[in-house]
Amino acid sequence: MTFSLLEAYNRLKETNAALAARLLEEAEWGVEFILKNRYGDGYRASSMGLLIWQDGVLNTLDDIHSVRVQNLAFDNFLYAGYETYAAMTIDRDPMLQEHLRKVAEEDFSFATEKFKKDGFDQFKQMYEHSYNTSHSQYMATISWSASMLYKLTGKSCYAETAAEAIRYVLDCQRTEPLKDKGRTCGFFYRDKSRKSIVHYIHQSREQVYMQAMTLLCETQKEHPDYQKWSNSLKLYGNYLKGLMKYTQPYGMVPSGVYHAEEYKDSAGFYSLHLFPPANAQELYTEQITRGVKLDKEHYLKRFPVWFSIFNGNTAIHLSTGKSAAICGNFLKDEELLNIGREQLYWTVGKNPFGQSLIYGEGYNYPQMNTFSSGEMTGEMPVGIRTLGNDDIPYWPQPGTKLCGA
């Protein structure tokens, strides 16, 4: 959230000073929170479970003691990138800027040492959004974070790390067309084994692949691998363009391509599908076959495959929409930029239900199931979902809607 606020601030600071100032103020609270939960030795408070609205007073009955503290290389790579971006953005506090630069380099160093020692993290907290992190997403995150630090410091070691990490990601991208009429390609697999394709449920980090590629192209234009990075962007952009015909006349970007037997990658399958039913593999097959068959092994799904309470499509299509916008800006491709815009249009009412999904914005926005905070202007739901094993939108009436997020 802090990173998004800072991105919005940079976008608006020249055109809407008042709104930009509020965005920066909120972002600075976020930066303070990030720094307070960093212990300076690789460990940090990573998350907590909370289902009540607390009184804000220490040592009372509603205190929560379930804070999860971990030393994960992935977390430190990710936060190093965020801290770096904050250091490049918050220019009204030189002392904070210098501190952010210092901790960003420290956190990246902690992450690098742990990654060299232990390899990919073993994610154990299933309620954290990192639990489903694939190896390709992991390496894209390393590359993006390293490029951020290179942009800030100019140190060649970060440029080298960024270029090296992305090679793994490129090896995970599908470049050979499927055997469908559209010759679909450009999507990413979870790892080099290519047993399963990158998917998300309930939350998404899809945009990190394109963030990493574009930042490499921006910061290392003379690198021998520049054309590989640029071509990766074009492949992925064409992949997104090819998806859009499956949701016409609406502009919601589909979930993407699925292999018929992704459940055989048991580690990836069960890190994605939390609390799956005993017949999850059979349900997987049922759900993908209700999508669009592309060839003997692949199907196109408009909505993700999902089995449990962890569903809702808002984060998924908005993240992919951000990927489209990133590609569109780099490639100067208006069709991709429009795909990004369509995800916003869907969110504010250009959907089959004619409802804005943002409380207080647009028309016909629904009541949310916000059981602890009450209704708040600007709140968004987890999103439109499907009914049973179908692959069409389902949006139940107020009182049974997904929890506001």
Question: Where do the language-model regions lie?
Answer:
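Solenoidal tandem-repeat scaffolds enriched in leucines and small polar residues
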Residues: 77-96, 103-109
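Long, well-ordered core segments of solenoidal/helical folds
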Residues: 26-43, 101-120, 160-184, 231-253, ...
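Short helix/loop segment immediately N-terminal to the Walker
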Residues: 15-18, 93-97, 117-131
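Acidic, Ser/Thr-rich low-complexity linear motifs
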Residues: 121-133, 176-191, 196, 360
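Aromatic (Trp/Tyr) and acidic
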Residues: 8, 52-89, 129-164, 192-242, ...
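Active-site-proximal loop/short-helix segments
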Residues: 49-56, 114-126, 137
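Conserved helix-loop functional segments at active or binding sites
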Residues: 10, 85-92, 113-120, 148, ...
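N-terminal catalytic cores of secreted or lumenal carbohydrate-active enzymes
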Residues: 2-71, 82, 90, 95
